[in-house]
């Protein structure tokens, strides 16, 4: 027995070599995974982490790609996939006492956000069937 899944249209945006460590960027990406794009941008606007700005840029870019390239309605977009990969590491030296040098690793990230259009049920979101009790 085979099942046929209807694939929702998806759009993707990627930011490469962003100067933020992948560990810190993953904390921010975990906040918005699975959320609606409007809600995710509101969350990222008030998030105190420095990585929230580049993540918000990628989310907005993915939404714009969905709207302009695929003609999707921005109100129906949900972040379906969001992940952060490790980019190239810039290696620097910090001079220390007595002629020593310590290595400083300036890490970069590749942030990928994928949004898909999920049709909303006709206005029944969050409502009860019965009246007030």
From Swiss-Prot:
Domain of life, per lineage: Bacteria
Pfam families named among the record's database cross-references: Ribosomal_L22 (PF00237)
Subunit comment: Part of the 50S ribosomal subunit.
Function: This protein binds specifically to 23S rRNA; its binding is stimulated by other ribosomal proteins, e.g. L4, L17, and L20. It is important during the early stages of 50S assembly. It makes multiple contacts with different domains of the 23S rRNA in the assembled 50S subunit and ribosome. The globular domain of the protein is located near the polypeptide exit tunnel on the outside of the subunit, while an extended beta-hairpin is found that lines the wall of the exit tunnel in the center of the 70S ribosome.
UniProt record similarity statement: Belongs to the universal ribosomal protein uL22 family.
rRNA-binding as UniProt keyword: yes
GO terms under cellular component: cytosolic large ribosomal subunit
Alphabetical UniProt keywords: Ribonucleoprotein, Ribosomal protein, RNA-binding, rRNA-binding
InterPro entries according to UniProt: Ribosomal_uL22, Ribosomal_uL22_bac/chlpt-type, Ribosomal_uL22_bac/org-type, Ribosomal_uL22_CS, Ribosomal_uL22_sf
GO biological process, one term: translation
Protein species of origin: Nocardia farcinica (strain IFM 10152)
Annotated protein name in UniProt: Large ribosomal subunit protein uL22
GO function term, MF aspect, one: rRNA binding
């Amino acid at each position: 027995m085979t099942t046929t899944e209807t694939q929702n249209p998806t759009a993707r945006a990627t930011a490469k070599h962003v100067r933020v460590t992948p560990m810190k960027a993953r904390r921010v990406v975990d906040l918005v995974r699975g959320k609606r794009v409007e809600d995710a941008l509101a969350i990222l606007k008030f998030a105190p982490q420095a990585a929230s700005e580049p993540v918000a840029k990628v989310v907005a870019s993915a939404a714009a790609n969905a709207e302009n390239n695929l003609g999707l309605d921005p109100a129906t977009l949900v972040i379906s996939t969001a992940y952060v990969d490790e980019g190239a590491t810039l290696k620097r030296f910090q001079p220390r006492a007595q002629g020593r040098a310590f290595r400083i690793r300036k890490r970069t990230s590749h942030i990928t956000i994928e949004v898909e259009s999920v049709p909303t049920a006709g206005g029944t979101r969050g409502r009860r069937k019965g009246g007030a009790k």
